[in-house]
Amino acid sequence: MNTPTHTHPHPFGSTATIRCERAAAELRTGRPVLLIDAHARRHAVMALDSMTAQSFATFANAVGNTHYLFLTPVRSNVLGLEAPQGARIPLATLSYDSLAKLAYLRQPTRPTAWAPGDIMDAAATEITRLALLLPAIVAAPLTQHTEHAFADCQTLDLADLDTAAACASTTEYELVTRTPVPLRDLGMSEFIVFRGGIAQRDQVAILIGRPDLSSAVPVRVHSSCLTGDLFGSLKCDCGDQLRHSLATLKALGGGVLLYLDQEGRGNGIAAKIRAYGYQHVGLDTIDADAQLGFGPDERRYTGAVMMLRALGITRIQLLSNNPAKAERLRAAGIIVKQRISVIGQITKQNEHYLRTKVSRAGHDLDIDALIMTSQRPQDPSETVDGETVKPIAKTGHA
């Protein structure tokens, strides 16, 4: 008598999300990843950000010098290339030292040989985003003669990226823990930690006061800014916005501040500090990011939406100067009844940054009017490096 057999998935089997996370971890540690498309084409890819001269030479030798550098459409435009799908630059005759110049250098030499990117390159760039690496890829198509060198590398089907993205937008975030925390000038608050999304990062919701969940809840969706929030950088107004938002939530009778792990508009702290270097020589915040291959704003708000839903919040008053943020939350199903502007201090160091956010990112802020109506502080503690900081109205309505 034959015993029927049943195929059961392994209880600790892999999923599309797990495979994407593993691929991101491999790139971040300087290892190649093998990408496979629907036609069974195979590409080996590495992130330039985590490569060394030695690993570059090893990769080039393994693929028989068929490797190329892929640059995003944004960086390609910086190079003067009309490449809406990004650009592949052949590397057979180029040295490792020349890669950084093509990928990051301001005003580099325009490459003469290049080809449009394709779906493989877009997928590889998405993995670098998950890994918080700069979006410059060294890649090569593989053949039966070259693929053996990558036999032990993480393999990722391009369909996994689509599946993982779909899961991230539908899978609820886990509430890990919550506890009361007394805050200076704000009284008792509650810190609520969520975990979810690709990479399972922890995100924090801070409950101020006792908001009425039956009406539109005041909410600030705040992206982390180490330099501004913690160290008081004068290059941005993030720290002011954070503190003024918390004060506004208290004044409105209570609300929620979502503190998201999205340093540098989603690009990561390393990319942000690199971009600061370009700002130091005169580029604005958007052009500085473009030098590195990033678009104006790489943030995604899936996590914020999931956290709000977990808290039972679907209608909000959004504390933000950014109309695009409100629209993206609306597109995800959150009802934004009102947008309340959040205004910080204008300094000599951040005025250009704020004007760029208005002129190029569409933020709703009348900087000239705010400067004209502000009162200069009399407290000598408001002087920084001999320069008087100009405080302005802390809240207002758009």
From Swiss-Prot:
Pathway: Cofactor biosynthesis; riboflavin biosynthesis; 5-amino-6-(D-ribitylamino)uracil from GTP: step 1/4. PANTHER family: 3,4-DIHYDROXY-2-BUTANONE 4-PHOSPHATE SYNTHASE, GTP CYCLOHYDROLASE II-RELATED. One of its GO terms (molecular function) is GTP binding. Its cofactor is Zn(2+). Binds 1 zinc ion per subunit. Residues 173-398 are annotated as: GTP cyclohydrolase II. Signal peptide: none annotated. Residues 375-398 are annotated as: Disordered. Its EC number is 3.5.4.25. One of its GO terms (cellular component) is cytosol. This is GTP cyclohydrolase-2. One of its GO terms (biological process) is riboflavin biosynthetic process. It comes from the Bacteria. The active site is at residues 297, 299. It comes from Xylella fastidiosa (strain Temecula1 / ATCC 700964).
